[in-house]
């Protein structure tokens, strides 16, 4: 599968970050995409205490959703799990969703930028792409008091100037059960549990009730196998 120049830049940018942090990355190919993760050996080597538990990051795109996201937050809190949420700016501003974002932040979840309208950044002029990201930065910072550092580009397509934007770290994924395409919770859970490896970044969506159900089940099963869930900043920087 050939990789576009923009997407290759995505991989190179994240690779450089990991090399800077002294971590050994590997490339994995899934569903025609290539994304970056951290191998189990490199994750363990970064922990001075040599933790026994393998770590993975649970990430959610496209929220918040007024009905399904609170249910997810309840489940994560009960299981003492922290996740990473890549939020759409216009969704944050809907209804009572600002309260949900505030709760995310207060409960220790990492909040990232997923653009304001879920647009394909690679197809926008530089100024338009910058506006999409900065508008969402502003919306999130208004609630949390902190501007998000981490971002995920919709469709995995980065803006043309992403390599020059040193203020933002783009995060990909390594396990994608395509939960947005099905309401079959069992199939989503099966895909993740069968494909998971230490250091993986799991992609799910908190805007779908079936995905929320799958996420909670995934947490239960992987915790039962000894996995620990961390936010993406801890996964790549610890």
Features from the language model and the residues they span:
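Terminal accessory/targeting
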Residues: 1-58, 74-83, 198-238
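Residue-identity detector for glycine
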Residues: 5, 9, 22, 32, ...
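Homeobox/homeodomain signature
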Residues: 10, 16-17, 101, 114, ...
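Active-site beta->alpha N-cap acidic-glycine motif
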Residues: 33-122, 128-129, 135, 139, ...
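Catalytic domains of cell-wall/extracellular-matrix polysaccharide-remodeling enzymes
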Residues: 119-228, 233-238
């Amino acid at each position: 599968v050939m990789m576009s120049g923009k997407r290759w830049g995505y991989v190179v940018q994240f690779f450089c970050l990991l090399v800077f942090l002294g971590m050994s990355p590997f490339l994995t190919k899934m569903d025609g995409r290539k994304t970056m993760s951290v191998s189990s050996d490199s994750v363990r080597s970064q922990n001075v205490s040599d933790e026994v538990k393998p770590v993975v990051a649970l990430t959610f795109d496209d929220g918040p959703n007024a009905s399904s996201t609170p249910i997810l937050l309840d489940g994560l809190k009960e299981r003492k799990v922290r996740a990473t949420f890549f939020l759409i700016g216009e969704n944050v501003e809907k209804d009572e969703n600002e309260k949900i974002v505030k709760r995310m932040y207060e409960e220790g979840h990492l909040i990232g930028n997923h653009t304001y309208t879920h647009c394909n950044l690679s197809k926008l002029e530089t100024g338009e792409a910058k506006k999409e990201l900065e508008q969402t930065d502003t919306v999130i910072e208004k609630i949390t008091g902190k501007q998000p550092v981490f971002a995920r580009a919709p469709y995995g397509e980065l803006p043309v100037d992403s390599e020059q934007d040193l203020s933002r770290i783009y995060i990909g994924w390594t396990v994608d059960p395509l939960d947005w395409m099905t309401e079959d919770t069992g199939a989503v859970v099966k895909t993740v549990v069968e494909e998971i490896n230490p250091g993986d970044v799991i992609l799910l969506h908190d805007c779908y009730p079936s995905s929320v159900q799958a996420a909670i089940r995934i947490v239960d099963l992987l915790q039962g196998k000894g996995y620990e869930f961390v936010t993406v900043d801890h996964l790549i920087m610890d």
